[in-house]
UniProtKB/Swiss-Prot annotation:
GO molecular function, one term: phosphoribosyl-ATP diphosphatase activity
Pathway in which this enzyme or protein is active: Amino-acid biosynthesis; L-histidine biosynthesis; L-histidine from 5-phospho-alpha-D-ribose 1-diphosphate: step 2/9; Amino-acid biosynthesis; L-histidine biosynthesis; L-histidine from 5-phospho-alpha-D-ribose 1-diphosphate: step 3/9
Annotated organism of origin: Gloeobacter violaceus (strain ATCC 29082 / PCC 7421)
Biological processes, Gene Ontology terms: L-histidine biosynthetic process
Name of the featured protein: Histidine biosynthesis bifunctional protein HisIE
This protein's UniProt keywords: Amino-acid biosynthesis, ATP-binding, Cytoplasm, Histidine biosynthesis, Hydrolase, Multifunctional enzyme, Nucleotide-binding
UniProt-annotated stretches for the region Phosphoribosyl-ATP pyrophosphohydrolase: 132-218
Cellular location(s): Cytoplasm
Region annotation (Phosphoribosyl-AMP cyclohydrolase) ranges: 1-131
Pfam short name (any one): PRA-CH
EC number of the protein: 3.5.4.19, 3.6.1.31
PANTHER family (UniProt xref): HISTIDINE BIOSYNTHESIS BIFUNCTIONAL PROTEIN, HISTIDINE BIOSYNTHESIS BIFUNCTIONAL PROTEIN HIS7
Similarity annotation: In the N-terminal section; belongs to the PRA-CH family.
Amino acid sequence: MAPHQFKSKGAPTLVHVREAARFDRDGLIPAVVQDVLDGTVLMVAWMNREALERTLETGESWFWSRSRQELWHKGATSGHRQKIKALRYDCDSDVLLLTVEQQGDIACHLGERSCFHRDEAGDYDLPPADTLSQVFRVVEERKAHPHPDSYTSRLLEAGSNKILKKIGEEATEVVMAAKDGERVAEEVADLWYHTLVLLAHADVDILDVYRALQQRRR
């Protein structure tokens, strides 16, 4: 079977991966899996050489189960497959990094987006992603659990007209800042923040926006 062409700019060639990957004495190498949309770490699994070859050939994640002592195709049963967008190795060539498009936004067998959904205290807490995603999750938290001292909570409770008015005001301030050449970053941050509030109010996930942006790259 011909190798699947998933290589993106900056990723190593398939030949380099095959030659560079350093397997341990058990013939395994750890593979960290991250979401292409926002960089969230989804899971860590193990590959042997055959799992790596199948991943390269099919463009989907294959791993080696140490407990069952067999290959497994991620998502073959659940439907939560991982389409490889890029594959890299670290400076010592003994860890792989798979950047994937996660089908169904679920990587964990417990039904969570990430296997790392517990913090050091055992509380539910998804791992950090990019800054916009983190801010959006805070906005969602304010929506789910309003706080009287929170500007975000008050804005959400005020409704769409208030939110839309603020977005219009912030957009105007971005234009004025760009003309003056001052405070552009701060004003854009304000505009983005209020846009995130609108997304939460409209029950639109930021990952859907990222998917739309991915389409703009083509």
